[in-house]
Amino acid sequence: MTKFVFVTGGVVSSIGKGIVAASLGRLLKSRNYSVSILKLDPYINVDPGTMSPFQHGEVFVTDDGAETDLDLGHYERFTDTAMSRLNSVTTGSIYQAVLNKERRGDYMGGTVQVIPHITNEIKDRILRVAKDTNPDVVIIEIGGTVGDIESLPFLEAIRQFRTEVGRQNVLYMHVTLIPWIPSAGEMKTKPTQHSVKELRSIGIQPDILVCRCDRPLYPGIKDKMSQFCDVPVKSVITCQDARSIYEVPLILEREGLAAQVLSLLNLEQRTPDLSEWQSLVEQLYRPKPPVEIAIVGKYVRLTDAYLSVMEALRHAAIAVGCELNLRWINSEDLENNNPEAYLGGVTGVVVPGGFGIRGVDGKIAAIRYAREHQIPFLGLCLGMQCCVIEWARSIAKLTDANSAEFDPQTSNPVINLLPEQQDVEVLGGTMRLGLYPCRLLSNSLAYQLYQETVIYERHRHRYEFNNAYRNLFLDTGFVVSGSSPDGRLVEIIELPEHPFFIATQFHPEFRSRPNVPHPLFKGFVQAARTHSSDRSNGHTPSETPSLSV
């Protein structure tokens, strides 16, 4: 029988429920338990695919093409397990499903209500994850904060869930904040008491409290929490702020979280193997030579919009053995200013994905700067499309070249709409999404990094390289090193005369793991480290460095 752990949050939003859920997943997996993690988001959007990055942050894409919350990225990276569209549920998708059933007549003329129809649909989605993958434990994170009106149907559903599947199969974990008040010189438990009181008024009694704090809980705090929240002292878990999110599983292991979860769910206590994770964190904190990577993007005001890119760079830096310093650059700032003022001194440039014309000329300026100054470069999705435009204008002498997305009337649309997108009118969920194969050119940098002929990567785009210009580009030194198996879609481009210049139509960042860095990011960071070393020694790189994978 699958066990279920529900993770709620109290006091403040963005308290770290996703990291706690992902960390618990890692701890259970280290004990050889199979785990799946589900995110219940209370917003009414069907999915985050059409939401502004400034409001939502990154849209994480799964293998099966679901556009999901960024927390699913944490789940995958911590557990090294691929999630699917079943692992992401929103209020909008629940209501959409219920209304579709009502229109079909599935409810036989009954009055459709929050209870039981909405709550039943929520419970069905949870059970579907258990049925699909048959894990030992399903961890369910409920988005938002206890007390939010949007979360009430989810909380009611998980209250009912315990009765329906058996009390011995369900555990409630509440992540809360214990703030330090400097003027009083003490930690305050009252916000947590009120949060737990709110949960109990709904009918949910937490079994475990995970207490976020910026310092150790001093003696007596756990006893007080236990007394006022009706939770055993050993189930009051300290989760102190860490330098890196990857240390959190180790902190929670020391606090005995996994052992307590297994005890409450009547599961066998097994010895964890966290040696690889411990080594990862030790490498992360070890002093190393620095590399400074510029991320030139449109949404840098909210860096969570590029969360998987940041994490993939961190994974690579750990593997390569260097200290990662990120320089965030708003691409709009480069449109009317000298790129040298913003990019001078960096050892690598990343131009990530995005949509729309705003800031595109700044991205193109950054690409030109990296190309001309022999700085290691990595372009992702829109970053690749901007590389194509820059090459067309600067090298192929098509000065008016553009993407049909930015200028539908351009006489040289080097980037064009995918044929299957021509008649699409609805924006949500209609892009080229999910995992697709890509065939690599054998004598290319891409092949040198991947060491495979056919790779699989995740996509999220509507536009592609226009093959009408392919021969012109190839004649000017442009290399298409990766394409769809039928040769129609350009997936990877590179410049062999550059120390490291590669760009992809797909999003490699979604498949990077802390213990298995993505080969493109590892190669890029290694090239950035070489560039930094050469610059320190007064050398100018003139050829592609030898890259180990």
Curated annotation (Swiss-Prot):
| Superkingdom in the source lineage | Bacteria
Under Enzyme Commission nomenclature, its number is 6.3.4.2
Describe activity control.
Answer: Allosterically activated by GTP, when glutamine is the substrate; GTP has no effect on the reaction when ammonia is the substrate. The allosteric effector GTP functions by stabilizing the protein conformation that binds the tetrahedral intermediate(s) formed during glutamine hydrolysis. Inhibited by the product CTP, via allosteric rather than competitive inhibition.
- Active site (catalytic residues): 381, 507, 509
Q: Which residues bind ATP?
A: 14-19, 71
**Keyword Acyltransferase applies:** no
Which segments constitute the Glutamine amidotransferase type-1 domain? 292-534
Q: Which GO terms describe its biological process?
A: 'de novo' CTP biosynthetic process; pyrimidine nucleobase biosynthetic process
Output the Gene3D superfamilies linked to this UniProt entry. Answer: 3.40.50.880, P-loop containing nucleotide triphosphate hydrolases
User: Which residues, by range, are in coiled-coil regions?
Assistant: none
Instruction: Tell me the protein family, please.
Output: Belongs to the CTP synthase family.
**What's this chain's function?**
Catalyzes the ATP-dependent amination of UTP to CTP with either L-glutamine or ammonia as the source of nitrogen. Regulates intracellular CTP levels through interactions with the four ribonucleotide triphosphates.
What is the name of this protein?
A: CTP synthase
Q: Which gene encodes it?
A: pyrG
